């Protein structure tokens, strides 16, 4: 049984109070960041998270289709199809989306990191990036297992094509790099083409990376 105090502390979201012409207004911290066009992609990627992220992207596009969106990523990865729904939405909307990894961008997290606008993909100095091929566990009749295995192969090929598109690496290099868990430092990720720049302080990129 989970400790109720731990559960409370882990789900406690800070509130911020803003003064307006109509008085005070309270926001949870993530809603306040959304007003600044900042989206936090934090934790495992799953259908619930992808729905929230896609909704935020579409909302910000509707508010201003020409103003950039900043996405902060700290994720171990997760469900491939959920991640692809976020990826497709990032490519679909009109605003440019900058990405910044804080902590880690592993598995689908790394794909979403490199899916940011070219020249606007960043990492903090001590962040880690990990790429690998998709995996899955299936059970049931042998025929069904074979069907799922073929689907996983198709997803693997599609993911490889996306990495090729955004990193500039050739297909053979991507396939070799994703064969096993491949951990990278920020410097390695930049050299491989997953990101464009390593940020140590806001400086001149303040307006782009938020």
From Swiss-Prot:
Fourteen ClpP subunits assemble into 2 heptameric rings which stack back to back to give a disk-like structure with a central cavity, resembling the structure of eukaryotic proteasomes. The keyword Hydrolase applies. The lineage of its organism: Bacteria, Pseudomonadati, Pseudomonadota, Alphaproteobacteria, Rhodobacterales. It catalyses: Hydrolysis of proteins to small peptides in the presence of ATP and magnesium. alpha-casein is the usual test substrate. In the absence of ATP, only oligopeptides shorter than five residues are hydrolyzed (such as succinyl-Leu-Tyr-|-NHMec, and Leu-Tyr-Leu-|-Tyr-Trp, in which cleavage of the -Tyr-|-Leu- and -Tyr-|-Trp bonds also occurs). It comes from Cereibacter sphaeroides (strain ATCC 17025 / ATH 2.4.3) (Rhodobacter sphaeroides). PROSITE patterns: CLP_PROTEASE_HIS, CLP_PROTEASE_SER. Belongs to the peptidase S14 family. Its main location: cytoplasm. It comes from the Bacteria. GO terms for molecular function: ATP-dependent peptidase activity; ATPase binding; serine-type endopeptidase activity. GO terms for cellular component: cytoplasm; endopeptidase Clp complex. Its EC number is 3.4.21.92. Cleaves peptides in various proteins in a process that requires ATP hydrolysis. Has a chymotrypsin-like activity. Plays a major role in the degradation of misfolded proteins. It is an enzyme of class 3 (hydrolase). This is ATP-dependent Clp protease proteolytic subunit. It is found in: Cytoplasm. Disulfide bonds: none annotated. Keywords: Cytoplasm, Hydrolase, Protease, Serine protease. PANTHER family: ATP-DEPENDENT CLP PROTEASE PROTEOLYTIC SUBUNIT. The keyword DNA-binding does not apply. Signal peptide: none annotated. Gene3D superfamilies: 2-enoyl-CoA Hydratase, Chain A, domain 1. SUPFAM superfamilies: ClpP/crotonase. The active site is at residues 107, 132. One of its GO terms (biological process) is protein quality control for misfolded or incompletely synthesized proteins.
């Amino acid at each position: 049984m989970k400790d109720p105090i731990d559960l409370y502390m882990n789900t406690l979201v800070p509130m911020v109070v803003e003064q307006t012409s109509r008085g005070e207004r309270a926001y949870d911290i993530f809603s306040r960041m959304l007003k600044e066009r900042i989206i936090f992609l934090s934790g495992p990627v799953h259908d619930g998270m992808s729905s929230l992220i896609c909704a935020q992207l579409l909302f910000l596009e509707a508010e201003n289709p020409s103003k950039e969106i900043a996405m902060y990523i700290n994720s171990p990865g997760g469900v491939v199809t959920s991640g692809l729904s976020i990826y497709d939405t990032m490519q679909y909307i009109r605003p440019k989306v900058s990405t910044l990894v804080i902590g880690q961008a592993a598995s689908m997290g790394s794909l979403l990191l490199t899916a940011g606008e070219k020249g606007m993909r960043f990492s903090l100095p001590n962040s880690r990036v990990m790429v690998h091929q998709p995996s899955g566990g299936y059970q049931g009749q042998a025929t069904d297992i074979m069907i799922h295995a073929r689907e996983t192969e198709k997803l693997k090929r599609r993911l490889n094509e996306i990495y090729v598109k955004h990193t500039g690496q050739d297909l053979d290099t991507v396939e070799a790099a994703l064969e096993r868990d491949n951990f990278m430092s920020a410097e390695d990720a930049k050299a491989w083409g997953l990101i464009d720049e390593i940020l140590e302080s806001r400086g001149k990129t303040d307006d782009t990376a938020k």
